[in-house]
Amino acid sequence: MKNIDDLVDSASDLAQRGLSKGEIADELNVSRETASWLVERSGTGTEPDTSDDGGPHDIHVDWSAVGRDSNRLYHAGAAMADLLSKKGDDVDLTIGIEKAGAPLATTVARELETDLGTYAPTKHQWDDDESETSDGSFSRNFAQIRNRDCYVVDDTITSGKTMGETIDAIHEQGGNPVACVVLADKRGIGDIRGVPVYSLLQVIRVGSDGDS
């Protein structure tokens, strides 16, 4: 994807396939507000925004060149594991945030010799006309928390809300999140809920909202 029109087209396609705006945000690595704006701009949304305000301020991170190749994906995951290798003692569980965090977490878990779990965040159920009443959940097909120390893995941090939700969910299950790692951090966050966050890349928007 090279321009905003590509993103609008992709958002439109995903919306027509029945994905919620939360899922579209996850697929395009943008905030939920940006995903909503893209869908509305495409004309697929129920109430298109006709105001010409230049759109939301966000950064799109396209790491599909890594994700579509298993060898590149492995090496990216191994680099993320290296960032965590000296963070915490006796950590034996890695939690991947679905969807994109799960394959990265698989490599991290393999490299650090931990069990693997996955968490489906609330945002996958989010849409403009729905309140956020549903909870996220841990998949029963993978390892459970069971009061263990764990790492948390995702592809990008946009606002930090999803990572914070996952940390809270781990605490509710009696677990102890020791550290988080992502491919790209768009906020430059050092920690969330007191849990340190590490990233291979920090992608920071420069300029005020009034800049053209």
UniProtKB/Swiss-Prot annotation:
One Pfam family, please name it. Pribosyltran
Keywords from the UniProt entry? DNA-binding, Transcription, Transcription regulation
Question: Example GO biological process term?
Answer: pyrimidine nucleobase biosynthetic process
InterPro entries with a match to the protein in the record: GcfR_halob (IPR053401), GfcR-like (IPR022854), PRibTrfase_dom (IPR000836), PRTase-like (IPR029057)
Q: Does the keyword Amino-acid biosynthesis apply?
A: no
Under Gene3D superfamilies, the record lists: 3.40.50.2020
**An example molecular function term from Gene Ontology annotations:** DNA binding
Residue ranges of region Disordered?
A: 38-60
State what this protein does.
DNA-binding transcriptional regulator that functions as a regulator of central sugar catabolic pathways.
The family assignment reads: Belongs to the purine/pyrimidine phosphoribosyltransferase family. GfcR subfamily.
PANTHER family in alphabetical order: OROTATE PHOSPHORIBOSYLTRANSFERASE, PYRE-LIKE PROTEIN
Q: Sorted alphabetically, which HAMAP family does this protein's record hold?
A: GfcR
User: What name appears for this protein in its UniProt entry?
Assistant: Transcriptional regulator GfcR
Q: What is the lineage of its organism?
A: Archaea, Methanobacteriati, Methanobacteriota, Stenosarchaea group, Halobacteria
Designated gene of the protein: gfcR
